[in-house]
Amino acid sequence: MALILSACSQENSPNETAVVTENAPQTTQPSEAIRIAAAANLSDVLPEIIEGYKKDKNLPNQEIEVTFASSGKLYSQITAGAPYDIFLAANQEFPAKLVDGMFKGDSSRTPFTYTQGQLSIYSAAKPVDSLNQSTLTELLKRDDKTKITIANPELAPYGESAKAYLQAQNLYDSLTAKKRIIQAENIGQAFQYAHTGNVDYGFVAQSQVTAIKATPEQFYILPADSYPAILQDGIVITDVASAADFTDYLRSPAGQAYFAKAGYLAVK
């Protein structure tokens, strides 16, 4: 069988898929396919975790289908009946809304925290490693030509935290009024805008910076206490046994090691 990845963001065609075939011999009978709806910021680390899961569990032929998109878009798909087994959001809000909505009264559907994200400033062309909160604020205030990008704060938790950070620095309203904020659909597209030079700076996930092996001068990790904590929750949607087994692996020391290596903060 295969690991199937798809994306719902604008930077990837909705119909585009990547298939990686496993040639290792089957040592354990795989369960039925696991279908995962995953926040766009997981597009780099989740495939590695899946391969680790299949190796550690002796399930080389386990089929796992992943759709990456903004958490808000995935939430809408799930409430509309999309056939997912697991929802891995980029915040705690959307899994909680499922509990209060379509899973109301079902005590077996309990969200769990699987990682904590870090917010960074990234630029493909301008050095940012010498920045701190004060100098970043001054930079964004004084340079009227500078454009930044954030993910849609209504749909993407990283965008919501970026907006909160800018509001705390009394920057958001003025930058919006001057049309200096280029809003991306999700964190994946925000990173593409910054990485390709379409904007000067991007508020991105540190995991994205780690994935491309960015040089130290290309990013600045914002202090964790300067924006709302990006605690990422998941929830098992169906009764597929392998879905619960996979989410247990996410929270295990082995799963958390993948997250830490990828630029996230491990959770217990």
Enumerate the language-model features and the residues they cover:
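A short beta-strand/loop micro-motif in the catalytic core of glycosyltransferases
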Residues: 88
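Bacterial Sec-type N-terminal signal peptides, specifically the leucine/valine-rich hydrophobic h-region
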Residues: 4-5
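Central helical "cap/lid" subdomain
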Residues: 102-112
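Exported/periplasmic ABC-transporter solute-binding proteins
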Residues: 8-54, 59, 72, 79, ...
